[in-house]
Amino acid sequence: MAKVLYITAHPFNELVSNSMAAGKAFIETYQQQHPEDEVKHIDLFETYIPVIDKDVLTGWGKMSNGETLTDDEQMKVSRLSDILEEFLSADKYVLVTPMWNLSFPPVVKAYIDAISIAGKTFKYSAEGPQGLLTDKKVLHIQSRGGYYTEGPAADFEMGDRYLRTIMTFLGVPSYETIIIEGHNAEPHKTEEIKATSINNAEKLATTF
Protein backbone atom coordinates (compact mmCIF):
# COMPACT_ATOMS: atom_id res chain seq x y z
CA MET A 1 0.00 0.00 0.00
CA ALA A 2 1.30 3.44 -0.95
CA LYS A 3 0.47 6.81 0.56
CA VAL A 4 -0.26 9.67 -1.85
CA LEU A 5 -0.33 13.35 -0.99
CA TYR A 6 -2.67 15.19 -3.36
CA ILE A 7 -1.44 18.76 -2.98
CA THR A 8 -3.52 21.49 -4.62
CA ALA A 9 -2.61 25.17 -4.89
CA HIS A 10 -5.55 26.91 -6.51
CA PRO A 11 -8.14 29.18 -4.87
CA PHE A 12 -10.90 27.83 -7.15
CA ASN A 13 -12.30 24.36 -7.78
CA GLU A 14 -12.47 22.14 -10.85
CA LEU A 15 -15.49 23.98 -12.24
CA VAL A 16 -13.32 27.07 -12.78
CA SER A 17 -9.75 25.78 -12.95
CA ASN A 18 -8.40 23.58 -15.74
CA SER A 19 -5.56 22.31 -13.57
CA MET A 20 -7.99 21.38 -10.80
CA ALA A 21 -10.26 19.63 -13.33
CA ALA A 22 -7.34 17.51 -14.53
CA GLY A 23 -6.24 16.94 -10.96
CA LYS A 24 -9.70 15.75 -9.95
CA ALA A 25 -9.83 13.38 -12.92
CA PHE A 26 -6.40 12.02 -12.05
CA ILE A 27 -7.00 11.43 -8.36
CA GLU A 28 -10.46 9.89 -8.84
CA THR A 29 -9.12 7.48 -11.45
CA TYR A 30 -6.08 6.75 -9.29
CA GLN A 31 -8.30 5.81 -6.35
CA GLN A 32 -10.39 3.55 -8.58
CA GLN A 33 -7.29 1.82 -9.95
CA HIS A 34 -5.42 1.68 -6.63
CA PRO A 35 -8.12 1.20 -3.98
CA GLU A 36 -5.59 -0.12 -1.46
CA ASP A 37 -3.59 3.13 -1.46
CA GLU A 38 -4.15 5.97 1.00
CA VAL A 39 -4.78 9.42 -0.49
CA LYS A 40 -4.53 12.59 1.60
CA HIS A 41 -5.64 15.93 0.14
CA ILE A 42 -3.72 19.04 1.18
CA ASP A 43 -5.22 22.34 0.01
CA LEU A 44 -2.33 24.78 0.34
CA PHE A 45 -4.70 27.76 0.31
CA GLU A 46 -6.45 26.33 3.37
CA THR A 47 -3.29 25.15 5.16
CA TYR A 48 -1.25 27.19 7.61
CA ILE A 49 2.36 27.14 6.40
CA PRO A 50 4.68 29.42 8.37
CA VAL A 51 7.10 31.31 6.16
CA ILE A 52 10.74 31.06 7.13
CA ASP A 53 11.13 34.30 9.06
CA LYS A 54 13.01 35.65 12.08
CA ASP A 55 11.01 33.49 14.51
CA VAL A 56 11.72 30.31 12.55
CA LEU A 57 15.42 30.97 12.04
CA THR A 58 15.87 32.00 15.66
CA GLY A 59 13.87 29.01 16.85
CA TRP A 60 15.95 26.57 14.83
CA GLY A 61 19.09 28.13 16.25
CA LYS A 62 17.81 27.84 19.80
CA MET A 63 16.85 24.21 19.26
CA SER A 64 20.39 23.43 18.09
CA ASN A 65 21.76 25.05 21.25
CA GLY A 66 19.23 23.49 23.61
CA GLU A 67 17.71 26.87 24.46
CA THR A 68 14.08 27.68 25.26
CA LEU A 69 11.94 28.99 22.41
CA THR A 70 9.33 31.73 22.68
CA ASP A 71 5.70 30.74 22.14
CA ASP A 72 5.70 32.15 18.60
CA GLU A 73 8.97 30.43 17.74
CA GLN A 74 7.75 27.11 19.11
CA MET A 75 4.41 27.34 17.31
CA LYS A 76 5.99 28.05 13.93
CA VAL A 77 8.83 25.54 14.26
CA SER A 78 6.44 22.81 15.43
CA ARG A 79 4.06 23.47 12.56
CA LEU A 80 6.89 23.28 10.02
CA SER A 81 8.04 20.01 11.59
CA ASP A 82 4.52 18.56 11.27
CA ILE A 83 4.37 19.54 7.58
CA LEU A 84 7.75 17.92 6.95
CA GLU A 85 6.89 14.69 8.74
CA GLU A 86 3.61 14.37 6.83
CA PHE A 87 5.52 14.89 3.58
CA LEU A 88 8.11 12.27 4.49
CA SER A 89 5.41 9.74 5.37
CA ALA A 90 4.15 9.65 1.76
CA ASP A 91 5.42 7.67 -1.21
CA LYS A 92 3.94 9.72 -4.04
CA TYR A 93 3.08 13.39 -4.51
CA VAL A 94 0.63 14.98 -6.93
CA LEU A 95 0.96 18.77 -7.10
CA VAL A 96 -1.71 20.80 -8.90
CA THR A 97 -0.89 24.42 -9.67
CA PRO A 98 -1.78 27.21 -12.08
CA MET A 99 0.89 29.36 -13.69
CA TRP A 100 0.96 32.72 -11.97
CA ASN A 101 3.46 35.33 -13.13
CA LEU A 102 5.51 32.69 -14.97
CA SER A 103 5.72 30.50 -11.86
CA PHE A 104 3.13 29.28 -9.35
CA PRO A 105 1.23 30.67 -6.33
CA PRO A 106 3.42 31.72 -3.38
CA VAL A 107 1.89 29.04 -1.15
CA VAL A 108 3.75 26.46 -3.23
CA LYS A 109 7.12 28.06 -2.49
CA ALA A 110 6.24 28.23 1.20
CA TYR A 111 5.44 24.50 1.13
CA ILE A 112 8.66 23.65 -0.71
CA ASP A 113 10.63 25.66 1.86
CA ALA A 114 8.93 23.69 4.63
CA ILE A 115 9.99 20.33 3.22
CA SER A 116 13.47 21.22 1.94
CA ILE A 117 15.35 20.54 5.15
CA ALA A 118 18.97 19.44 5.47
CA GLY A 119 19.25 16.10 7.22
CA LYS A 120 15.67 15.18 6.31
CA THR A 121 15.11 15.51 2.56
CA PHE A 122 18.72 16.15 1.57
CA LYS A 123 22.14 16.09 3.20
CA TYR A 124 25.55 17.63 2.74
CA SER A 125 28.46 15.33 1.99
CA ALA A 126 32.07 15.57 0.86
CA GLU A 127 30.78 15.26 -2.72
CA GLY A 128 28.22 18.04 -2.22
CA PRO A 129 24.46 18.01 -1.51
CA GLN A 130 22.71 14.65 -1.84
CA GLY A 131 18.96 14.12 -2.10
CA LEU A 132 17.36 11.66 0.31
CA LEU A 133 13.97 11.16 -1.40
CA THR A 134 15.29 8.34 -3.57
CA ASP A 135 12.15 6.20 -3.38
CA LYS A 136 9.51 8.86 -4.14
CA LYS A 137 7.45 9.81 -7.19
CA VAL A 138 6.14 13.23 -8.19
CA LEU A 139 3.48 14.35 -10.66
CA HIS A 140 2.99 18.04 -11.41
CA ILE A 141 -0.23 19.15 -13.10
CA GLN A 142 -0.11 22.76 -14.26
CA SER A 143 -2.36 24.97 -16.37
CA ARG A 144 -1.03 27.90 -18.40
CA GLY A 145 -3.12 30.29 -20.46
CA GLY A 146 -0.40 30.72 -23.05
CA TYR A 147 2.14 28.41 -24.64
CA TYR A 148 5.33 27.91 -22.66
CA THR A 149 6.45 24.35 -23.38
CA GLU A 150 7.90 25.36 -26.74
CA GLY A 151 8.33 28.57 -28.68
CA PRO A 152 9.56 32.07 -27.78
CA ALA A 153 8.06 32.00 -24.26
CA ALA A 154 9.63 28.68 -23.22
CA ASP A 155 12.55 30.33 -21.43
CA PHE A 156 10.13 32.35 -19.29
CA GLU A 157 8.54 29.29 -17.67
CA MET A 158 9.82 28.99 -14.10
CA GLY A 159 7.14 27.01 -12.25
CA ASP A 160 7.44 23.46 -13.50
CA ARG A 161 11.14 24.03 -14.14
CA TYR A 162 11.67 25.00 -10.50
CA LEU A 163 9.68 22.06 -9.15
CA ARG A 164 11.57 19.62 -11.36
CA THR A 165 14.88 21.14 -10.24
CA ILE A 166 14.10 21.09 -6.52
CA MET A 167 12.72 17.55 -6.65
CA THR A 168 15.84 16.39 -8.48
CA PHE A 169 17.92 18.16 -5.82
CA LEU A 170 15.97 16.26 -3.15
CA GLY A 171 16.73 12.98 -4.90
CA VAL A 172 13.33 12.17 -6.42
CA PRO A 173 14.00 9.74 -9.31
CA SER A 174 10.59 9.97 -11.01
CA TYR A 175 9.07 13.33 -11.99
CA GLU A 176 6.20 13.55 -14.47
CA THR A 177 4.09 16.42 -15.74
CA ILE A 178 0.70 17.07 -17.25
CA ILE A 179 0.74 20.53 -18.80
CA ILE A 180 -2.50 22.21 -19.86
CA GLU A 181 -1.75 25.27 -21.96
CA GLY A 182 -3.04 27.61 -24.63
CA HIS A 183 -6.65 28.04 -23.54
CA ASN A 184 -6.28 31.83 -23.21
CA ALA A 185 -4.15 32.17 -26.32
CA GLU A 186 -6.72 30.22 -28.35
CA PRO A 187 -10.07 30.47 -26.55
CA HIS A 188 -11.84 28.55 -29.31
CA LYS A 189 -9.81 25.49 -28.30
CA THR A 190 -10.56 25.72 -24.58
CA GLU A 191 -12.86 22.71 -24.36
CA GLU A 192 -10.59 20.60 -26.56
CA ILE A 193 -7.55 21.48 -24.44
CA LYS A 194 -9.41 20.71 -21.23
CA ALA A 195 -10.76 17.38 -22.53
CA THR A 196 -7.29 16.32 -23.69
CA SER A 197 -5.77 17.12 -20.30
CA ILE A 198 -8.45 15.14 -18.47
CA ASN A 199 -7.90 12.18 -20.78
CA ASN A 200 -4.13 12.37 -20.21
CA ALA A 201 -4.67 12.55 -16.45
CA GLU A 202 -6.93 9.50 -16.41
CA LYS A 203 -4.44 7.49 -18.48
CA LEU A 204 -1.48 8.37 -16.27
CA ALA A 205 -3.44 7.57 -13.12
CA THR A 206 -3.51 3.88 -14.02
CA THR A 207 0.29 3.57 -14.01
CA PHE A 208 1.49 6.24 -11.58
Curated annotation (Swiss-Prot):
It is an enzyme of class 1 (oxidoreductase). The keyword Oxidoreductase applies. Pfam families: Flavodoxin_2 (PF02525). It catalyses: 2 a quinone + NADH + H(+) = 2 a 1,4-benzosemiquinone + NAD(+); N,N-dimethyl-1,4-phenylenediamine + anthranilate + 2 NAD(+) = 2-(4-dimethylaminophenyl)diazenylbenzoate + 2 NADH + 2 H(+). GO terms for molecular function: electron transfer activity; FMN binding; oxidoreductase activity, acting on NAD(P)H as acceptor; oxidoreductase activity, acting on NAD(P)H, quinone or similar compound as acceptor. The keyword NAD applies. Its cofactor is FMN. InterPro entries: Flavodoxin_fold, Flavoprotein-like_sf, FMN-dep_NADH:Q_OxRdtase_AzoR1, NADH:quinone_OxRdtase_FMN_depd. Keywords: Flavoprotein, FMN, NAD, Oxidoreductase. It comes from the Bacteria. Its EC number is 1.6.5.-, 1.7.1.17. Belongs to the azoreductase type 1 family. Homodimer. NCBIfam families: PRK13556.1 (NF010075). Quinone reductase that provides resistance to thiol-specific stress caused by electrophilic quinones. Also exhibits azoreductase activity. Catalyzes the reductive cleavage of the azo bond in aromatic azo compounds to the corresponding amines. This is FMN-dependent NADH:quinone oxidoreductase.
